[in-house]
């Protein structure tokens, strides 16, 4: 859901966020 949004927002900045 919104988790994917955060991924695109600063996923490149925080790779770990992509896994979350």
Swiss-Prot record:
<protein>
    <recommendedName>
        <fullName>Unknown protein NF045 from 2D-PAGE</fullName>
    </recommendedName>
</protein>
């Amino acid at each position: 859901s919104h988790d994917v949004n955060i991924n695109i927002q600063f996923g490149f900045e925080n790779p770990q966020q992509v896994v979350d």
